[in-house]
From Swiss-Prot:
Gene name of the record: sodA
Homology family: Belongs to the iron/manganese superoxide dismutase family.
Subunit-level organization: Homodimer.
Highest taxon in the source lineage: Bacteria
GO function terms (MF aspect): manganese ion binding; superoxide dismutase activity
Source lineage: Bacteria, Pseudomonadati, Chlamydiota, Chlamydiia, Chlamydiales
Full protein name: Superoxide dismutase [Mn]
Pfam families tied to this protein: Sod_Fe_C (PF02777), Sod_Fe_N (PF00081)
Amino acid sequence: MVFSSYMLPALPYDYDALEPVISAEIMQLHHQKHHQGYINNLNEALKSLDVANATQDLARLIAINPALRFNGGSHINHSLFWEMLAPQGKGGGVPPRHELLKLIEKFWGSFDNFLKNFITSSAAVQGSGWGWLAFCPQKQELMVQTTANQDPLEATTGMIPLLGVDVWEHAYYLQYKNARMDYLKSFPSIINWDYIENRFVEMSKQ
């Protein structure tokens, strides 16, 4: 089986578009260096997987799995992350409406209560990881989840990621230093709730 190479997705905005919440320097490094690096490593792991499959090398197949999980998860998470953001004045920070808002209010009482829960849970991630607004299509339930390192939410929990925030230090340290909470408190003003609501509508039909 031959795998196609993955490529770095283009951002739907300029590197400086999310300022002052996320600096252009961070966005460029995060996208061009970190995300591209994960993709390069993923493609190398897939090449090795090809060889291992062709030779039926079970030990090599097992050894490749951590690299696939880490770098594949990184690519999934970051590809979603870029789409979940929007500049202020161009949709960023405009609260959700319609059915998603109703469901958020059902589970948290208010949109503000949800944001507090999301920020607090994401800030509490030990080391590196992600904070998520997750959706379970089978139960039509929302919940806040966190994942360690670059674990992809759906592959590890079965939940659908609607909103994610990267709490790896490379996502904020150049600008916020060790003040992760300051980064997270600023983050809601660049969330693209239109994209997330459309994703919710699509996923709720599954």
